[in-house]
A protein has these predicted regions:
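Glycine-rich phosphate-binding loop of actin/hexokinase-like ATP-binding domains
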Residues: 1-5, 16-19, 25-98, 102, ...
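Phosphate/ATP-binding catalytic cores across multiple sugar-kinase/actin-like superfamilies
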Residues: 14-17, 145-167
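Feature representing long, continuous alpha-helical segments
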Residues: 102, 106, 110, 142-145, ...
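Generic secondary-structure signature for well-ordered alpha-helical cores
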Residues: 23-26, 47, 81-84, 109-117, ...
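Catalytic cores of large soluble enzymes that bind and process phosphate-bearing ligands
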Residues: 6-10, 96-100, 135-150
């Protein structure tokens, strides 16, 4: 089964998210986000589906980062702090080759926790080691900040058009592979 695109910037993957949102229509308000190069956002409210697309850039997919890669063998997919030290989980085990989107979000949250990254996104050490040889640079942090800002702008705009604020949304669903591996606590910590 191949789903059609909704429009030039809202593709078939987003259509599957919107189909899920439609299936949940008994619920009051649901926001769904499909994060990729385009951040596609859907809002189900008052029996109507509204959507928008933002230019999130590829940072959440690991692309465009100094050591970014897709979520495949060798990618750091999760990072935790244990006894004051970063501990990374690498897909497939073995030595890390790069870092994927979920790993970047975790790594930034951990660097914040360890006070090696401040609230403005400034790294104490550039590059910051995550799982040697994998590290994050100041430019990587800025790319993630730009992607986050694009998603946030899309969410706020869509809510404002519908006369809502963030607190009005009953649920937020993050779709796709990225959504499946994203640690909600890490995402919340980095904003």
């Amino acid at each position: 089964l191949v789903l059609p695109s909704i429009d030039g910037y809202v593709g078939a993957d987003a259509l599957s998210v919107y189909t899920w949102v439609k299936a949940m229509e008994g619920r009051k308000k649901i926001l769904a986000v499909d994060i990729g190069t385009n951040g596609e956002i859907a809002l189900w409210h008052r029996g109507q589906l509204s959507c928008c697309s933002t230019a999130a850039g590829p940072a959440f997919e690991g692309a465009g980062l100094s050591m970014g890669m897709a979520g495949k063998t060798g990618a750091v997919e999760h990072v935790r702090v244990q006894d004051g030290v970063l501990q990374a989980h690498v897909i497939g085990g073995g030595a890390p080759k790069g870092i994927c989107g979920s790993g970047v979000i975790d790594a930034l949250a951990c660097l914040l926790e360890l006070e090696q990254l401040d609230e403005t996104g400034l790294l104490e050490q550039d590059p910051a080691p995550v799982a040697p040889p994998v590290c994050l640079t100041q430019k990587d942090v800025r790319m993630v900040q730009l992607a986050k800002s694009a998603i946030c702008a899309g969410l706020r705009t869509l809510l404002r058009v519908e006369g809502l604020c963030g607190a009005d949304a009953a649920e937020l669903a993050v779709a796709g592979g990225f959504g499946s591996y994203l640690d909600v606590n890490s995402a919340g910590l980095i904003g």
